[in-house]
């Protein structure tokens, strides 16, 4: 009986894998829940079908709970988006997904990875700094703010080679 309760309340481990067109609706829904302007299913599908785009997902109990997506160009990649469902944040899932994704990008020949992040998104900035990203530029007034004052985008870079 104790084994039953242990299994029932145990924290499930996420399953990390490449994302594909089958994940379009779930990625679009998670993106919409995570960002002020979410991607439509058509936008997500277009990205997932693009041969220069790499995407990974995290499934928790069979449900998509996080994703990361990048576009490759020559020997560089740009992380287009990272999202983790609110209920799954704070447990290291984004770190695991980011590390897997960076290894795969390196395996595909990317020597440097770039991304943009809202200057007020401290959790994401902390994640990226811990993963070895460093600020290389700042775009003032880039992100619209609900309070009327736009936020800067920090441009971060990490060398893979």
Positions of the model-derived regions?
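Flexible coil/turn residues that form the inter-helical turn or adjacent wing/linker of helix-turn-helix
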Residues: 37, 111, 149
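Conserved SAM-binding loop
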Residues: 16, 117
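Conserved catalytic-core motifs of GNAT/GCN5-like acyltransferases
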Residues: 2-3, 114-116, 129, 134-151, ...
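Active-site phosphate/pyrophosphate-handling residues
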Residues: 96, 126, 154
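Short glycine/proline-centered loop/turn elements that form peptide/ligand docking sites
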Residues: 98, 121-124, 141-147
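Short amphipathic helical patch at the helix-1/turn junction of helix-turn-helix
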Residues: 84, 118-119
């Amino acid at each position: 009986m104790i084994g039953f309760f242990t299994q029932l309340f145990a924290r499930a481990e996420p399953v990390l894998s490449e994302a594909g067109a089958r994940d379009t609706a779930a990625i679009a829904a998670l993106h919409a829940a995570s960002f002020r302007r979410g991607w439509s299913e058509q936008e997500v599908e277009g990205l997932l079908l693009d041969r220069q785009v790499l995407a990974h997902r995290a499934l928790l109990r069979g449900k998509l709970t996080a994703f990361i997506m990048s576009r490759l160009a020559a020997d560089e990649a740009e992380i287009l988006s990272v999202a983790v469902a609110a209920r799954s944040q704070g447990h290291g899932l984004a770190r695991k997904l980011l590390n897997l994704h960076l290894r795969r990008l390196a395996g595909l020949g990317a020597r440097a990875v770039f991304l943009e992040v809202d200057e007020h998104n401290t959790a994401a900035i902390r994640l990226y700094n811990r993963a070895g990203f460093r600020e290389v530029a700042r775009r003032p007034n880039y992100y619209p703010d609900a309070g009327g004052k736009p936020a800067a985008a920090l441009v971060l870079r990490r060398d893979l080679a």
